[in-house]
Amino acid sequence: MPNLDDILSVAPGVISRESDGELVVVLPEQGKFVVLNGTGAEVFQLLDGQRSLSEIAVVLSERYEVPLEQAQTDVLALARKLLDRGAVRVSSE
Amino acid sequence: MTEFNWTFAVGGLSLSLAGPAAWVEPFARAWASWADESLGWVVRLVQDETLPAPQKPFFGARPRFVDGRCLLEVPGFAGEIAPEDETARLRAHPAAEPGDLAYFVRTAFALQAFDADTLLFHAAGVVHRDAAYALFGHSGSGKTTASRLSSGKPVLSDDLVLLRPSVSGWEVWATPFGRQRASQQVRSAPLRALLRLVQAPEERLEPMPRAAALGELAANSPVINADPVRSAALLARWDGVLRSVPVYFLHFRKSNAFWEVIDAQLG
């Protein structure tokens, strides 16, 4: 279960491609994929192994003018989904 | 032990099998109509009694990519495909089944096809009114069923087809890899549409979002979707296909009435 202090990065071998405003994330090791919509795609691209989930939530909160708490909830939910699928990994805590 | 060499070609791509007659001759018999004499990749099959007896079918081996080579290793089998050298070599216990050997040949062919700018695609290919429809979906989605329901129409394959670019667009080519025998008269046709199978109580076509289609098509690209090096190019290639042909969900029952829906919307 990720927390807001976690720093996530894209798992090795995972690739992505934008298509019609959505991001297709392919997990070669599993032969599976995840499709992310606009906001999800932005979060995925911010998972650069440098920023914490908390910092990413701040970016989204400011960019979309949504309450920080809402942005944190959304970022954590997406992080959980991506960790479950093996698309990202925790770099450090 | 008698050695035997035999070459076949799919969509203009040749692949030569070399190995014990007992292992190669069954391919020559089963795939006789695919025989060819061109030079192409070489797949060498080697019996190795020092390997442990197979515990499971080779089909369960996941391709692993190391230093540009594709490795398939499970007890009883040690396969290595070297795309740069255009060669592949499988050492297998003598108890290996023909299906195990065919799996390795198919894996080598998937890499050969991709490196020749084509795509081996987990889909059934059915020709209707001189155009090919590629029916895809997860295992059990109905590829074989839909092929069997398409009576009177040439079936290019019920499991794996080759997509090849041409000056006028993408073509679907038959392969010998399916369970159902491919048409001997019709070996290719221009690709008209990609149809994602959905078993349903009625027949209808529904446009499929392109991002979801891209993901599913990549997931249905055997071997290549397991290669971190080729995966980006795989997505780009499928993106190119999706820019030239439409993709739909095909909701269908166990009847051939879905062709009427296809005619009404795409005919």
Could you describe each region identified by the protein language model?
Chain B
Residues S141-K143:
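Conserved glycine(s) of the Walker
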